[in-house]
Amino acid sequence: YSSYCRLWIHVEGDKEPAYYGVYEMIEAIDDKYVKRRKDLFGDHKHNLWKCRWGATLNYNDIHGANIYYDDDSGANYTYELESNTDNFETAKAQLIEFTKNLTQRQGDDFHDWIASVCDVRLLLRTYAVNVAVGMWDDYWNNCNNYYIYFNSSDRDNYKFFFIPYDYDNTLGT
């Protein structure tokens, strides 16, 4: 989430605080973000992925994708594991299996699977908000600027959450 604030800095000895302008405050999406929402997510200790440009969630594309964990190197990866990095290989296998199911299941099989791993209403509401605000730099337009969270490390038994971010250009900041 983001908001704006007016920043004044009070320097000891000065008569009035100094006004520094309007700044954007952005809540980081990290393990603390997930922990603050553990009632929604059902857990806060599992796999949070940052997904950048090219993160299609398509099983046919993921094998050539740049999948790594946050190593503080400053490198940008298509899919970057932000939490639970000690279990990277397990998290990566879960992500790949998720994309396989998302891409290859069809009909009632897909319907039953997606309903079991995702709050479909919440996902559709998220998409509707992105459309309503004209979000042009997101998953649905550029396969970009979103996080996904799996509330379990189990390859088949989890809930998936889609977390969009980076609305600054869309909202005119």
Language-model-detected regions and their locations in the chain:
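Phosphate/dinucleotide-binding and metal-coordinating scaffold of catalytic cores
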Residues: 1-173
